[in-house]
Amino acid sequence: MMSSLSVEGMLLKSARESCLPARVNQRRNGDLRRLNHHRQSSFVRCLTPARVSRPELRSSGLTPPRAVLNPVSPPVTTAKKRVFTFGKGRSEGNRDMKSLLGGKGANLAEMSSIGLSVPPGLTISTEACEEYQQNGKSLPPGLWDEISEGLDYVQKEMSASLGDPSKPLLLSVRSGAAISMPGMMDTVLNLGLNDEVVAGLAGKSGARFAYDSYRRFLDMFGNVVMGIPHSLFDEKLEQMKAEKGIHLDTDLTAADLKDLVEKYKNVYVEAKGEKFPTDPKKQLELAVNAVFDSWDSPRANKYRSINQITGLKGTAVNIQSMVFGNMGNTSGTGVLFTRNPSTGEKKLYGEFLINAQGEDVVAGIRTPEDLGTMETCMPEAYKELVENCEILERHYKDMMDIEFTVQENRLWMLQCRTGKRTGKGAVRIAVDMVNEGLIDTRTAIKRVETQHLDQLLHPQFEDPSAYKSHVVATGLPASPGAAVGQVCFSAEDAETWHAQGKSAILVRTETSPEDVGGMHAAAGILTARGGMTSHAAVVARGWGKCCVSGCADIRVNDDMKIFTIGDRVIKEGDWLSLNGTTGEVILGKQLLAPPAMSNDLEIFMSWADQARRLKVMANADTPNDALTARNNGAQGIGLCRTEHMFFASDERIKAVRKMIMAVTPEQRKVALDLLLPYQRSDFEGIFRAMDGLPVTIRLLDPPLHEFLPEGDLEHIVNELAVDTGMSADEIYSKIENLSEVNPMLGFRGCRLGISYPELTEMQVRAIFQAAVSMTNQGVTVIPEIMVPLVGTPQELRHQISVIRGVAANVFAEMGVTLEYKVGTMIEIPRAALIAEEIGKEADFFSFGTNDLTQMTFGYSRDDVGKFLQIYLAQGILQHDPFEVIDQKGVGQLIKMATEKGRAANPSLKVGICGEHGGEPSSVAFFDGVGLDYVSCSPFRVPIARLAAAQVIV
């Protein structure tokens, strides 16, 4: 039975109201009236408010909250509104307002609406942050009045006032962008304390708690708002602990903490030449400014750059009444995931600290206990927490990351957001949630990011049992996978080493948001402090970066650039291996092995394959590459570069050099006859590996000088003189003639085959002989021959004539005729412009986007590094065009050539075979243009398969 209540033009409906006891029903109706009278509320979800207890629900025969609200009038616009309140069963926002309220603010509003215990607060919108930046980094007109009005609501709800010693209200001020950026922006806790307020708080809640909160606030406010290094406060704390002969800050007495507060206040004067601001309203204004400022901090900008986060207006600011986990042994704080973010296992995964505040867990300041300890010491709060987790998973239909505090045995929910997860975790969670009926396969495809698959394709240790004797310490397995590198102790060094091509293991006592660049550059991360939900762990998991945290056995000395494990000393530059799955720290350079595809991943990829339209092929030059590609789900070979086969042995490269030195076609044919068996053998292996799938083989493309060594030629010249009978002077002269001013636009591609038809003849003969041989062995062969660097239809016509002539001869000699295709690479802009002419000659087009990008931009791929970073930093380019397809320029050539080619030849097959074939946003563009396939490296095939599916769903 459905009951309804009409209030000021909005019809509120609850599917369960008639089932509730009468007194609960009356209470809810009163709440709903108050909700609908609240000004500018966009819409409200009528769900069980926080004040309806679970026992009342259970006594009515109901499960925890699932009531719904269907608004029948259009929602009130929130375009002009900049401050939104929430708490105690009501809110002015909802989870769909992330772009305006940030992820944290939207989810606080949502948790409030569904009846969870959320401390009242207000969210200042991201639009206000944008206005702040545009207003010269000062609060825009009228905003402080709106904040004050929101604060009045919080004070009324909490029956407390900011700055009132008799009824003290303390606040947290936190950032929250629309996209999660763990640790990148600022937080201030316990705001509102001064000497008078702390005395009042001490009278109500105890002196130790009050002064512990005060010293934390002085530290955090000083660092975040005043720019005082945290280390200056930490020095005072460590000095006092040493004087008292204690190890934990929890062992400090109230008198100790009171003394520490005075020392902290002196830090302000020593570091800034000014006193700590005691006016709570001024503290709040400064804190809001600091959070807005942190949006534009170097670490936040770097994080957004690394993760390609663009288009956001700014960060929201969440001002919330404080609840305290540091009020003794009946209080605590924790962070959890509703499923294991590393493995995906359906089990609560998190950490808990008794008598602590949330930043102690998240910042890795103290190494916390496993969440299971909470069940033992606070069973009622733990039971409610488990129920809340189930409610949130059902509501959001996703794995959630939750922060909570227990204050004197009462649970408070401080944050929920979609949890960051590893590749392994993402795939298992997606598959399990489909099996549980929470989501469908299309939603599952959207849930797994292409970066997640990239992580799954990273190597693991070849033989974990082989290194057991080299394990010197074990920390927490914070982010799975394996990492091998040389030890470094600063983020700056890690970035420098990475730029030099060195593999670094970043070793820190604990990481901070300032380390984000070095963390991204490092192969792996090792920290002495911090738990599974510390900054290092969360950021590393988000990137699929191997991380071992909370390794209490190590002592890090940044000044000496060493760390010690007992008597053992590990220096900068020493090789170290990390197992992020087990937490093992291993001396030396351990061997890595390629990863294997799990059953969950196979199931997930089958859903992606059913959804996508675009075929995914691979660039593979050897039988092993082809086998890897097939195992990774490739539907054929889109590019086999024949020149790579020439470097496989000394005999092959010698034969190539003889061919290059040849003066007459006859001499050249003798050398090519030596190469033919090698090429035929390689093609046979590739055809065998790709049985039943197309194999596109590109004829010789690079300039001939690339097959000659650089530097000292004397040894090679002498060798060639013996092999060819030419004099040294003749060989030097030949080499000199081969050198070009601009070789990438010189004597290469089809120009070689036209100038030396015998070169094309040899390669094509090897292809067709291998194809017939494999066919005779029962292998289904689908050969496709690709002519490179065509700029005119006449060039392609010439090479097709040579190819068809050789094919006819081989088929006649071997008594077998096969179907085959001949096509071309479109990599010269002119070819794209006259694609209708070239399309009449070709069976297929394959866009060589690497060269097409070079020639369209006029950038040399080998030299672009000299200015590319400047262009990216100044916004001249948004992306590296050799990584992400330039849709406005190069992309338009691809679109035009596809349309023109198909107009001339409706059966024309069209694909791409450049590096862009494995880049997700480029794959989306190629699908939109209507290409038939993309081809990428074997290890990126699963990524391209998923990207192609995500375009459709």
Swiss-Prot record:
GO molecular function, one term: metal ion binding
Cofactor (UniProt): Mg(2+)
UniProt PTM comment: Phosphorylation of Thr-533 in the dark inactivates the enzyme. Dephosphorylation upon light stimulation reactivates the enzyme.
Disulfide topology: none
Ways its activity is controlled: Activated by light-induced dephosphorylation. Inhibited by dark-induced phosphorylation. Both reactions are catalyzed by PDRP1.
List of residues that carry Phosphothreonine: T533
Record keywords: ATP-binding, Chloroplast, Cytoplasm, Kinase, Magnesium, Metal-binding, Nucleotide-binding, Phosphoprotein, Photosynthesis, Plastid, Pyruvate, Transferase, Transit peptide
GO cellular component: chloroplast
InterPro entries: ATP_grasp_subdomain_1 (IPR013815), PEP-util_enz_mobile_dom (IPR008279), PEP_util_AS (IPR018274), PEP_util_C (IPR000121), PEP_util_CS (IPR023151), Phosphohistidine_dom_sf (IPR036637), PPDK_AMP/ATP-bd (IPR002192), Pyruvate_phosphate_dikinase (IPR010121)
GO biological process, alphabetically ordered: photosynthesis
Family to which the UniProt record says this protein belongs: Belongs to the PEP-utilizing enzyme family.
Species this chain originates from: Flaveria trinervia (Clustered yellowtops)
Pathway membership, UniProt: Photosynthesis; C4 acid pathway
Compartments, record wording: Plastid, Chloroplast; Cytoplasm
Function: Formation of phosphoenolpyruvate, which is the primary acceptor of CO(2) in C4 and some Crassulacean acid metabolism plants.
Residues the record lists as binding substrate: R641, R698, E827, G848, T849, N850, D851
Enzyme's top EC category: transferase
NCBIfam families for this protein: PRK05878.1 (NF004531), pyru_phos_dikin (TIGR01828)
EC number(s) per entry: 2.7.9.1
Residue sites binding Mg(2+) per the record: E827, D851
Active site: H535, C913
Record remark on domains: The N-terminal domain contains the ATP/Pi binding site, the central domain the pyrophosphate/phosphate carrier histidine, and the C-terminal domain the pyruvate binding site.
The name this protein goes by in its record: Pyruvate, phosphate dikinase, chloroplastic
